[in-house]
A protein has these predicted regions:
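Nucleotidyltransferase catalytic core that binds NTPs
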Residues: 2-216
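Alpha-helical structural context
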Residues: 42, 109, 164, 227, ...
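Residues at secondary-structure transition points
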Residues: 61-69, 93-97, 230, 234, ...
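N-terminal leader/targeting helix
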Residues: 96-106, 110-113, 266-296, 384-386, ...
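Short helix/strand-capping connector loops at secondary-structure junctions
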Residues: 179-191, 353, 370-380
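Charged phosphate-binding loop/patch that engages nucleotide di/tri-phosphates or the phosphate backbone
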Residues: 193-217, 376-408
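Divalent metal-dependent catalytic cores for phosphoryl transfer on phosphate-bearing substrates
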Residues: 222-226, 235, 244, 249-371
Length: 408
């Protein structure tokens, strides 16, 4: 049986068509995915390998994300893409990577398969200057992807390459999203959302690993990570992601939202430590709060944000303080941080998809719905409901009613 299976694999490999898509992927984005899908469909490829560069000759940057992290993001992005996989062939080889070296190794691994090396059409102009261009075309067909309407200019370049080096040059026109990795990095650094520009699983990873953030946020996140455990820090960074998206959609300060989200759980210190810090700061605790310090971590967090992390902005401090059970005077900014905490993408509970959609339509109604969901969960666990929860709901319902009836 093993013999038949092995023979089948060998026969299959003889007829396989494999796309090779190289790049730094710093980070991988939906433009990359669209190109791979288009080429795969157009040429009938069996698979596309995303070859993550260690040090490609045409891109040098001291600020480049470590190869292992870029590879992990590509793996995450391709998890649900059929017939696509990440390759660390250049990373394992190390040093400066040339296309011809990668194709030699790919051909050694896939002796009978047809290889298709995928590039942006803008790279055709410099192709004759690449290392061993003739051998590249002996090892693989060159597939140039360009935007529709540029076919004539690209075809002339392709004809020149065919005439000089022989081999096969394919041109594929695709009208995908106009995205660059540079733009993704810039947006993250400037606290702008990259939702739908980067595959969600890769986007989550870039936030978890705190990539592309400004130096001040990197340093603050490092301080916070020294206090929180790994699980809580992951949640914190994904709350940052959600807060930035909600704030941007609702026209609020995304930079403030990023900072508030980063500090929202800075007092999740454990029961004894939370109580000890509260007493040190002169905060009078009720018996209920002593028994359940999680009820006050948001209030203590606001004190820590001010006294330990140097935040003086009242809007940020209020949002940190109000992110657990809210208050009657919740502002839209408060609601963004509250909702980001409850709806960040690692959360998974009943109705969360509907709640996320509602959060982008109506902050008040989404906050009410999440609070009611919290009450249901708390009651099912046999725990007491914080009295502020009902006060917050009543105030927000009154506000929604006034808004719907024009204030009458």
């Amino acid at each position: 049986m093993f013999f038949i299976h092995k023979r089948f694999r060998m026969l299959y490999n003889m007829h396989m068509k494999i796309g090779i898509y190289g790049g730094t992927f710093d980070p991988v984005h939906m433009g990359h995915i669209f190109v791979a899908r288009s080429v795969k469909q157009e040429l009938g490829l069996d698979s596309v390998d995303f070859v993550v560069a260690a040090d490609p000759p045409h891109k040098h940057s001291a600020e480049r994300t470590p190869a292992a992290l870029r590879f992990d993001m590509v793996c995450a992005a391709l998890k649900r893409e059929r017939g696509m996989r990440a390759s660390d062939i250049e990373i394992r080889r190390g040093g400066v990577s040339y296309t011809v070296d990668t194709l030699r190794e790919m051909k050694r691994i896939n002796k009978k398969a047809g290889l298709y090396f995928i590039v942006g059409a803008d790279m055709l102009e410099d192709f004759p200057k690449w290392k061993n261009p003739k051998e590249i075309l002996e090892l693989a067909a060159l597939v140039a992807v360009n935007r529709r309407g540029q076919e004539r200019d690209i075809e002339a370049l392709a004809d020149g390459i065919r005439a000089e080096f022989g081999g096969r040059v394919e041109i594929i026109s695709a009208e995908g999203p106009d995205i660059s990795s540079t733009e993704i990095r810039r947006r993250v650094q400037n606290a702008q959302t990259v939702e739908r520009l980067v595959p969600l699983s890769a986007e989550m990873l870039l936030y978890e690993k705190r990539l592309y953030q400004p130096k001040s946020i990197e340093q603050l996140a490092e301080r916070v990570s020294n206090v929180l455990d790994e699980y809580r820090m992951r949640h914190t960074m994904l709350t940052v992601r959600e807060a930035v998206g909600l704030a941007q959609y609702h026209g609020l300060s995304t930079e403030k939202a990023r900072l508030a989200a980063l500090l929202h759980d800075c007092a999740k210190l454990g029961r004894e430590e939370t109580v000890r810090y509260a007493e040190k700061m002169g905060y009078a605790l009720t018996n209920e709060e002593r028994e359940n310090p999680f009820l006050i971590h948001s209030r203590i967090g606001a004190l820590l944000a001010r006294d330990l992390y140097g935040v003086q902005d009242t809007e940020i401090l209020n949002a940190v303080e109000r992110h657990t059970v809210g208050c009657a005077e919740m502002t839209p900014f408060d609601e963004v941080i509250f909702l980001a905490d409850k709806l960040e993408p690692s959360r998974d509970y009943r109705r969360i998809r509907d709640l996320r959609e509602l959060a982008f339509r109506d902050l008040d109604r989404a906050t009410i719905a999440v609070l009611r969901n919290t009450i249901e969960y708390t009651e099912n666990k046999g725990m007491r409901i914080h009295p502020q929860t009902e006060i917050t709901i009543a105030a927000l319902e009154k506000r929604v009613k006034a808004r719907l009836h024009g204030g009458d």
